[in-house]
Structure formats: structure tokens, C-alpha cells
Amino acid sequence: RDHAVAKIDINDNIAVNRATFGGWKIDACPHHGPAITRGGDWGYHMAWFDGGEKAGLFYGRIDGDAWVSSPAKRFGNANFQAGHPSLLSINEKVYLAWKEINESDNYIVLAISEDGGKNWLEAKKIKKTEGASDYPELIQFNNKAFLSWNTIKDGYQFIALE
């Protein structure tokens, strides 16, 4: 269940490159698609779940042909079912949000890079709710970052991240 990146040029030529190498084998749909966002003037930021031998969430930067950040960076707490990442890049600032769950609560965790994904500030739990909730989505509006999140208890939330 590895991922690939496809580039299509103006003549509709397609170049497909393998993007992850976890080797996870599953005979089902795990409902964990990757998150991808353009990385400034070049390349892409990508976050994904791998359920193989080293299960968890991973982040990397790819230029479309090869990994720029290697090895991929692990993030999230697997003990709290970290999953469903969302990515947003605004200039050199990269936002990475994901969901974690414990016995009764759901959390949204946010990590920020200010240098195009090379280094990351410490991840912080920024929202909490009891009961069921949707997955986080990061949205850009007027060059600012927002979190979109829907919960059973607290309803829909649209939160400025700065």
C-alpha cells in the first residue's frame, strides 16, 4: 500500500514515481489516504499513514522524482491512533495537523515548520472534544492558515492558526 506521485506535462505525458516504500500489504481499504501540498517554488510536502512493520504517520518532501528529505520523519503518537494527516504550505511555512484519540477524547495536534519542512517546532494539541469527530482539514484563505474541524459535541469549527 505504498503511494506514488504522477506528473503530467502540457502534452499529457505522465511520469509516475514511487513516493513511499513501507511495503505495507493489506487486503482491504484502510481509509488512510496521503496528504500532499505544493512546496513553494518546487516539490511537494507529503504526509501518510503506513501500517507495515513500523506502523505510524510519516512526513517527507519530494521534488516529484526523488525524496529530498530522507529518511521520512515519523510523527504522531501511535498509542493514540494518530492518523488522517492534513498539510498546508504557505511560502516557507508548513502546517501539519492530525487526529489522535484516547479512551474518551479526540484531539487535533499541530506541528509547524518555518523553513520548508527541514525543521519542526514541537507538536501541540490545539483542540479537544469528547466523543466522535471528523478529520482535520487545513485551509488557506488570504495567505493565512485555518483549521476546519467538525465534532458531535462542539459542532463545526473554523479556527485561525495564527
Regions found by a protein language model. Name each.
Residues 1-162:
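Extracellular, repeat-based ectodomains that mediate carbohydrate processing or recognition
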